[in-house]
Design a protein with these regions (language model features):
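Extended, Lys/Arg-enriched charged tracts that mediate electrostatic binding to polyanionic substrates
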Residues: 82-96
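Helix-start/capping segments and mature chain N-termini
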Residues: 1-64, 68-69, 73, 94, ...
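Charged, gly/pro-rich active-site loop segments
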Residues: 73-84
Length: 306
């Protein structure tokens, strides 16, 4: 059923509040120049939601029903889709354990809900990252590759500390050595070093971003070399010193593509080039495809037929 936004009645013993069985997704609906609503790769969100559900011991949700629910909601609320390029109707599907029970086990009942809200670009300027060396986001074999609510709770304090130092987000390093780059607070990350694009490989502790996947496909479609591999913070420092760090940008549903100005690491500031021509091309292409201004060569968009 579709209802106006309302409060969710919740028992104090709701298991999600105590044991953290909660996950979410995020995607955007846009509208093309002909007034047709569009969704960006909703099938991939459906797949990832079920991946997260399996990791958290939650039941899977019908992927067909997931996409159909989004289509129905967007069809009803399409007047709320901002027409400006870069803006969208942000969709937040989420699922949580709603059984009233005190005890450590999988819940017997869950709620699946989708809410919608108009949104505009988060970052319009280049951003500054702080490479964290005291806290971790996730460890190998943990829940880092799931879009679990608890992953974000663990990031709140380090993010606030980074912001207090003048940075925008945390750049997470690996849990064992604080050496290998993983991801940014709400984004995956790409570096262009000596003509080659590098993004950390999915090692079981990094979220498989749908924008990340799309950017890799787009770059390869445009004949850029893209490598998914382990990359150390020391390698980035060295590339910056040698003038080989040509670009760096983050990718994610909420931000789209965010150009990185610099990275703070211990007492070092890693400067990135002031220009991001390929990053800007990626951002302009994603935004253009989302409103039908640029041809959808990679079949990202799902049209909502009237």
């Amino acid at each position: 059923r579709i209802t106006p936004m309302e409060m969710i009645p919740m028992h104090p013993a709701c298991m999600a509040l105590h044991y953290g069985q909660a996950l979410f997704e995020g995607l955007k609906a846009t509208i093309d120049t002909n007034g047709t609503p569009l969704l960006f790769r909703p099938d991939k969100n459906a797949e990832r939601l079920n991946f997260s559900a399996r990791r958290l011991g939650m039941p899977e949700f019908s992927e067909t029903l997931f996409v159909d629910a989004l289509k129905e909601l967007v069809s009803l609320d399409q007047q709320w889709i901002p027409p400006q390029e870069g803006s969208a109707l942000y969709l937040r599907p989420f699922m949580f354990a709603d059984e009233a029970f005190i005890g450590m086990r999988a819940a017997n009942s869950y709620k699946f809900i989708v809410m919608a809200s108009p949104s505009k670009p988060i970052y319009t300027d280049r951003i500054r990252l702080y490479a964290e060396t005291s806290f971790i986001r996730a460890a190998y074999c943990g829940t880092g590759e799931a879009k679990a609510a608890g992953n974000y709770a663990a990031a709140v304090l380090p993010t606030e500390i980074a912001k207090s130092k003048g940075f925008d987000q945390v750049l997470w390093l690996d849990a064992k050595e604080f050496k290998y780059i993983q991801e940014v607070g709400t984004m995956n990350i790409f570096f262009k070093i000596n003509g080659q694009f590098i993004t950390p490989s999915l090692d079981g502790s990094i979220l498989a971003g749908i924008t990340r996947m799309s950017v890799i496909d787009f770059l390869r479609h445009k004949d850029f070399e893209v490598v998914e591999r382990l990359i150390t913070i020391d390698e980035i420092i060295e590339a910056s010193k040698n003038g080989q760090l040509e670009e760096a940008f983050g990718t994610g549903t909420a931000v789209g593509v965010a150009m990185i100005q610099e990275i703070g690491y211990k007492d070092t500031i890693i400067h990135v080039s002031d220009n991001s021509p390929v990053g800007q091309l990626v951002l302009d292409t994603i935004n253009g495809v989302r409103i039908g201004k640029i041809a959808d060569e990679l079949n990202w968009m799902v049209k909502l037929e009237s």
